[in-house]
Amino acid sequence: MKGTQTFDAVIVGSGASGGWVAKQLTEAGLRVAVLEAGRTLDPRVDYTEHKRPYDMPFRGRRLAARDRQARQPVQTQCYQCDEYTDHLFVDDIDNPYTTPRDRPFSWIRGRHVGGKSIMWARQSYRLSDYDLKAASRDGFADDWPIDYEELAPYYDRVERFIGISGQAEGLPQLPDSRFLPPMNLTCGEELLRTAMRERFGRTLTIGRTAVLTRDLNGRPKCHYCGPCSRGCVTGSYYSSPSSTLPAAAATGRLTVVDNAVVSHIVVGDDGKCRGVHYVDRLTRNQREVFGNIVVLCASTLESTRIMLNSSSSRHPNGIANSSGVLGHYLMDHVMGGGASGVLPMLRGVEDTRGNRPNGVYVPRFLNIDEQHADILRGYGYQGSAYESKWGHAMSIPG
């Protein structure tokens, strides 16, 4: 075994959760190692939010580069994966996985420092007791073992650091955050908000997004270039490389190990975690890193894989799996459908509000004041209304 190091804590994964754990532990005085399966990005090269279509060989089209489509048949199902961003998503040929033939699953992945916090859509909504204590209201399944009152101080702490812009609405089913100033609605969204309120009594609000509308903690406010999924050289939206990881690094107690593909947790004779075993992605050398604390922040499926692989005499079915439930009842990100339309009364009206990196949200409206026997719980809508540019012509037949 080549190369061993010892830290107070070892974190697997450098995305949204891994960055936060690193910040908290280093600021508490611990020496921390963060292991990331992919490379470290260079914002000057890898972030493409300021590139124009004429800078790209295929003008940024999603499926034009056939070689990329062939190597990324799963990743290109994600609306964020196109010619500008395909390098931020894994190569499906080099990173295969299997599913039952009759139960396919599209696993969207990004292997680099920051993970999918680079490409996420930044929408940030608080859960309420309508979510956490839903079973007490409708009798279905079980309540969470925590309630909103317990979570609220932690929401406050996160929001003060990363910055969430939005509009306070005072809705019990969607608690207000500690907001930065909200972004403006477009003309079409103003019309839609009025119609929904007058006809249905429903609320439409600007999206609650982790994008700065004023300078915060050394990060500048958004300059409305628009395509946040391509990265942000100014760090105006929340990602771990723009906020939590720099904060952890500033303590002098953070070590980031990139290209480290973790295979399993190292367990002592007493059955307790001692560290992790990983393979260097570039050299194929095997190494171990030890720590008194091991935190898995490698995403739902990767963290589960590592735990199942961590079998030992004390944990024959994988660590923390004496019940055999590990690997069942998982929840990853879901994809969705949608619909669109045209507001003819706004034809010819110029949108002068910039390329806003946000949409609108219609909060849950079902089963709030009274229960509907034929529908369980509720849902919200996300969307936007914007001025169509020349690209709309590509979707018109003929």
Segments predicted by a language model, with ranges:
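Residues that mark the start of a beta-strand
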Residues: T6-D8, L30-R31, G201-T203
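Gly/Ala-rich phosphate-binding loop of Rossmann-like dinucleotide-binding domains
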Residues: A22, T26
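Glycine-rich loop(s) and the adjacent beta-strand/alpha-helix scaffold that form part
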Residues: E27, R31, A37-P57, T251, ...
